[in-house]
Structure formats: structure tokens, C-alpha cells
Amino acid sequence: AKSLHETIDTLSCDDENQLFSTKTAYSDHPGQVSVSYEPTENQGVSSYYKAPAHFVMSIQDYATPQRNTSSYLTSSQPVMMPAGSYSFDLITNKLHYELQFDLQPGDTHDTLQHRLMRLINNSDLGVHAEVLQDDSGRSALQITSDAYGIPAKGNEHFRITDDNTSHSSGMVHYLGLNKDIETARNAAYTIDGEPQSSYGNTFRVYDAYEITLHPESAADKNTEIQVGLYPDPQS
């Protein structure tokens, strides 16, 4: 009898878990907030029992990475620095990297910026780089942290300097690698009027809903967004 009872309990639990997993979440602004329903179990109790079937959220800000954008320089103009070996240090909260590169006679700003972009992107430093172009024939190197949100330590995800580097210095100042620094921000939002924040744009609410904010949407901030579960017939 005990074995039969345990079997029935197991089947009941499996049926409940299957029922919970088939429920479908909705957002009435899916372009701004997408949602999935993924309840978890903690100490034998599913978050299904604690999570509300409906809540209202609004977004005040999105999580962003740190971005350093260099000076915009005429792309086709030769670099006005002596040819030779240069280096600069990229310092993160965890590691200290020295990036070494050569400047060849006749290298243009665009050539050098793309060389540094490839060097950074091939080095697995926790940042990535791209060359930006404007309508005036100028280009800039933008370096962006892979991490989003306010750093756990310090104010920056990374810092660039050539004050104590091992090869020729001066390229950080010449290119303006620290000219425009956009610091990282946390996502800021409310759940049923209560202020919340997150390091990233994907996070869990009530340990049952996985929410993803979409900064690329053109929707106005502070819009009230309805999130919840479809009634069973629509699940």
C-alpha cells in the first residue's frame, strides 16, 4: 500500500508540474517587454503557488554597457605619429591587459582604427570594438563592455591608459580613446508600483516569470505594461 501511495503522489506531482509548465504568459506590449512563464521549485514548493497571475510593470531605464567612443578623425588622413611599436593598457575589474600594435608609415586613421578593432575583438578581453563612420568622411573607434549594468566594484567596467605601458605611448591621447565615456546603467522598472532594478535587461520576477526588456523598441518609457498568464483555455 505504501508503494502504491508513493506512486500516486509521484504521478500527482508530475501532473502538477506538467500543468504549470503548459501555462503561457503574455505582455500587452510585447515589442517593449517579452515574457515567458518558467516557475521554479524551492524546497519542494513551486513558485507557481507564490507568483501572481497578473501584475503591472513600467520601465524607467534600460540596462546599458560602458561605451568609450574615440575622437572622430578624417578616415583617409595619415596618422600624425611616428611609425613604430605602440601599446596601451586595458584594465578591467578582474584583469590587466597590454595591447601591442605597430604603426606603419602611411597608415591612415581608418587603417589604424580597424587594426585596433581586430586586435581587441580577437583578444577575448570582455569588451568588443567597432569602427563608426559619420557623413563627413570621419571615423571613430568605439569600445563597448560585454557586461551590462553598474559594476559590482568601481565605476567602470574597463579603463584605457598608456601612462605606464612597455612600448611607445601617446596613442590613447592621439586617438582620443577616453574622449567620450558613457558609463553603464542598470535597468530600472516598477512591479505593481514597487521600484526594482537589474544589472541586465533579462531578469526573473516572482521567480516564475522571465522578463526581457527591449531597448530597441520605440515605445515610451513609464508606460504601464500588463503582464500575466492566459486563462487555462488559452494556454
Place the predicted regions along the sequence by residue.
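Bacterial flagellar/type III secretion structural subunits and associated motility module proteins
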Residues: E6-S235
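Acidic/charged coordination and interface sites in well-structured regions
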Residues: S3
